[in-house]
């Protein structure tokens, strides 16, 4: 315990003009529809309670008891099928205000693995704090948070190289930059050993003692960790059977006939009571918990933080991004030498009418530039994947060139050359869509966490992601196409090369867009099946395996949905159209020495420009759909 406290490096600094908040919930009931008959399953049943500032509160209970559901409701992430009320300082919670007043850190610490600890914290500060705050002040804030959470030695270490405990602490630090008075944690010790778990909870306790309302869903804590909590709520079958100080739990349980053995872990004892493994009067516990919650809500005694405690235990900084422009000016006038601050007095910012507050701390353009820089850094820093993609495009281009070597000008090998041109599209599609299916879900989880905690807007992230991917999207097909194109002796006219290159780039964008769409819409395992399966019809109606005019009439509408068809038509027209001279015939008879005759034979439907317009239309449609799915994912996470 002493070693853990030594890691915290408490900083004595001046107070932050912010008022502590007490969070109350009353008669919360949550139901979900569990089958086609619209039968409702009760997850939470009329639960009430109060979380006080300055105290570290644990929510404990067996699996399926409703702990995480309660946390999501209180954090504002879930509203569908929920009744009851949530109060902040005995006033109804205002959703817009609560986004600035709270943050929620999930069980899985979703962070970008290619950024360093320092970059992660600094980008969080840039996104969550006003642009009026200087870089020097932000650097000071980042440094103080690193000191507070014991991350100074890992500042130049990539997230992928951090230990589990360091990742957990970093996930706390990125939210800490805005000094939220209410913090929610879903199983912050999951996946950690006992020492790392103790360090994390010790940090949370210090944050609470700085004046925050800190609430944790916890699962089977050790006795030492359990003793760090001030208050406890025990949830069983959707009901709260205990809510109050940890020190009173054993006595309350004993009064209801549940006796805790000597030298027994009180957390295990509470779980056994909640799981009905110990015989006693559960109804008595429910009644006591109800009476306690009603008394607590009525009195709603806001804890006043002891002066000595607030000076000893630090929280975050005085330049909270949730403050208005007036409070930002006030921050700039204050001494910036100490920026890690406990919550204390009434904030002028909260006196400003809600409609005058900004939705985000910085402008949309500023969000876009920061996110674009971050995405570009991650894209080019992932050299293993980027290099592998480039090497594979080059090697496959060479292999394809060797297989179809110098057939591009041979009339007798025109069918084989057509297969080569189709294979270009086939390789580009799978080489650019499949890797994205595996890599994007991790980034999407980071986006979801940051967006739910009000870091930035969806459009800013969306456009930064698209633009950051463009350089690699253009470089890979360019390398592949140029190598294979000239090795196979295709026409070297500059306009033809440019036209084929344009089709390849557009097809790459389509492919990566579909990979992003599958990655965000499905689990990775399911996406790996769905994407190839959905591609099969596109290949069938491409015009390569069967001519369009030979399709049954009822199949014609489906042929218009094949992006492979438009890409194939565009390339084949570029290579054999535009008055190309006669091909070389090395055999006694060649049917298609005239390229125009071959184009007529295979049944070209549209001009090159029309095919490019259709491909561009597919790009617009796919990326609009991607935006809609991302927006739906955010909406669903709040339900």
Language model feature labels by segment:
Residues 241, 255-257, 380-638:
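Membrane-spanning alpha-helical segments of multipass transporters and channels
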Residues 57, 68-79:
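Short, conserved post-Walker A segment of ABC-type ATPase nucleotide-binding domains
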Residues 183-187:
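Catalytic Walker B motif of ABC-type/P-loop ATPase nucleotide-binding domains
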Residues 49-52, 75-76, 82-100:
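Conserved ABC transporter NBD signature motif
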Residues 175-176:
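ABC ATPase C-loop
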Residues 158-162:
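Conserved ABC ATPase signature
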Residues 1-41, 45-48, 53, 62, ...:
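Topological signature of polytopic alpha-helical transporters
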Residues 104, 108, 113-130, 141:
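Q-loop/switch helix immediately C-terminal to the Walker
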């Amino acid at each position: 315990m002493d070693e853990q406290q030594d890691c915290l490096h408490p900083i004595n600094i001046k107070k932050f003009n912010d008022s502590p908040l007490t969070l109350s919930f009353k008669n919360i009931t949550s139901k979900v529809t569990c089958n086609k008959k619209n039968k409702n399953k009760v997850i939470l049943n009329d639960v009430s309670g109060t979380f006080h500032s300055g105290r570290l509160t644990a929510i404990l209970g067996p699996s399926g008891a409703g702990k995480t559901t309660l946390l999501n409701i209180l954090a504002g992430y879930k509203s569908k099928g929920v009744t009851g009320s949530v109060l902040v300082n005995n006033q109804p919670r205002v959703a817009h205000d609560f986004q600035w007043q709270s943050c929620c850190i999930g069980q899985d610490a979703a962070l970008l693995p290619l950024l360093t600890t320092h970059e992660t914290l600094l980008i969080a500060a840039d996104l969550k704090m006003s642009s009026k705050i200087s870089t020097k002040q932000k650097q000071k804030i980042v440094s103080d948070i690193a000191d507070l959470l014991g991350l100074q030695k890992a500042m130049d270490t990539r997230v992928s190289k951090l230990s589990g405990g360091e990742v957990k602490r970093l996930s706390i630090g990125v939210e800490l930059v805005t000094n939220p008075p209410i913090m929610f944690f879903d199983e912050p010790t999951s996946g950690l050993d006992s020492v790392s778990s103790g360090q994390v909870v010790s940090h949370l306790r210090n944050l609470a003692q700085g004046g925050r309302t800190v609430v944790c869903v916890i699962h089977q804590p050790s006795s030492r960790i359990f003793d760090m909590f001030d208050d406890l709520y025990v949830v069983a079958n959707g009901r709260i059977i205990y809510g109050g100080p940890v020190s009173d739990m054993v006595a309350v349980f004993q009064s209801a006939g549940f006796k805790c053995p000597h030298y027994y872990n009180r957390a295990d004892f509470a779980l056994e009571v909640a799981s009905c493994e110990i015989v006693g009067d559960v109804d008595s516990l429910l009644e006591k918990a109800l009476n306690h919650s009603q008394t607590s809500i009525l009195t709603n005694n806001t804890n006043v933080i002891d002066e000595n405690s607030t000076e000893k235990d630090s929280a975050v900084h005085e330049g909270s991004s949730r403050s208005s422009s007036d409070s930002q000016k006030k921050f700039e006038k204050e001494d910036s030498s100490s920026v890690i601050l406990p919550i204390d007095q009434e904030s002028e910012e909260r006196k400003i009418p809600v409609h005058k507050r900004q939705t985000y701390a910085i402008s949309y353009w500023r969000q876009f530039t920061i996110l674009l820089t971050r995405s570009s850094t991650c894209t080019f820093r992932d050299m293993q994947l980027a290099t592998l993609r480039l090497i594979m495009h080059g090697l496959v281009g060479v292999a394809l060139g060797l297989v179809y070597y110098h057939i591009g000008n041979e009339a007798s090998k025109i069918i084989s050359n057509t297969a080569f041109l189709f294979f270009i599209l086939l390789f580009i599609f799978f080489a650019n869509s499949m890797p994205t299916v595996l890599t994007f879900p991790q980034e999407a989880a980071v986006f979801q966490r940051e967006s739910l905690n009000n870091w930035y807007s969806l459009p800013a992230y969306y456009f930064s992601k698209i633009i950051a991917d463009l350089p690699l999207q253009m470089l890979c097909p360019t390398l592949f196409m140029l190598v294979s194109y000239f090795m196979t002796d295709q026409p070297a006219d500059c306009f033809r090369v440019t036209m084929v290159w344009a089709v390849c780039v557009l097809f790459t964008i389509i492919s990566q867009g579909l990979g992003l769409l599958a990655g965000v819409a499905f689990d990775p395992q399911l996406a790996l099946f769905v994407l190839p399966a959905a591609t099969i019809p596109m290949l069938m109606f491409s015009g390569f395996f069967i001519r369009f005019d030979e399709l049954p009439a009822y199949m014609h509408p489906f042929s218009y949905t094949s992006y492979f068809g438009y890409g194939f038509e565009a390339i084949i027209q570029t290579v054999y159209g535009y008055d190309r001279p006669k091909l070389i015939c090395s055999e006694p008879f060649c049917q298609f020495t005239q390229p125009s005759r071959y184009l007529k034979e295979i049944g070209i439907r549209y001009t090159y420009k029309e095919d490019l317009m259709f491909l561009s239309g597919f790009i617009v449609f796919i990326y609009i759909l991607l935006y809609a799915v991302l927006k739906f994912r955010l909406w669903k996470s709040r339900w």
